[in-house]
Amino acid sequence: MITLQASHGRLRYLQILNKSGSTLVAILLAAGHSAAADDWLFPAEIIKEPTADRFSVCFDHTCRTIVTRSFSPGEWQRITVPLQVPAPTAAAERIAISHTIALMEQLVGEKTGTAGDRGGNLAGFGQPGQMDCIDESNNATTYLKLLQQDGLLRHHVVQNRSTRFGLFVGMPHTTAVIEDVAAPRRYAVDTWFFDNGELPVIMPLDEWKSGWRPDDDSHE
């Protein structure tokens, strides 16, 4: 049994493993009242209104490490190239968002020592600079807010993160979320499944919440 527990009475993930080490069950246990959950999912140290010259980055699982970093004007210009030409459709913009988020992760990885972050939780478990879905979803939401603030999202708005859990969807899992303003329909922007700097999953939130994983249907 492996227990990943944040400090100060925050929530805990319990992963129950079989003899081969594969995860059988993962249960999200609440410690204390809902305010404790809010502190864990939305740490107070995270900059809630980030700018390109001052934003937070979480890592080391459940945002146990939070640092402040910045993009220079030249860096910002380079990593936002996919979105600088307005996308003709929401679907095209989602593709551009995925490429932009990947570029942002690559650069942030250099700035924070998280370039070696592996997809999922187990591949890089115990190594410095690794991220779980709490780290990933906070960071992705920050990056999306930066894009929105700069007027680069023309078909979407950034929404609150979403968490899936239940008997048939596996361990609790959290993602960043955007909404197609014309549909309207919400989409998961999930950077957790793959290694740092790879294209994130962007797919309808309702499908994601049903327990989707990369070995299921294709995604954008």
Which stretches of residues belong to each language-model region?
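Short N-terminal segments immediately surrounding and downstream of signal-peptide cleavage
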Residues: D38-H61
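Low-complexity, Gly/Ser/Thr/Pro-rich intrinsically disordered linker/tail segments
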Residues: K209-E220
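N-terminal secretory signal peptides that target proteins for export/translocation
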Residues: M1-I16
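Acidic/histidine-rich, surface-exposed loop or edge segments in extracytoplasmic proteins
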Residues: F59-A91, D117-G126
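Bacterial N-terminal signal peptides
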Residues: S20-A31
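Sec/Tat signal peptide C-region and signal peptidase I cleavage site
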Residues: H33-A37
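Mid-length scaffold segments of soluble, non-membrane domains
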Residues: A96-H156
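Hydrophobic/aromatic-rich core segments of domains that either
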Residues: K145-W208
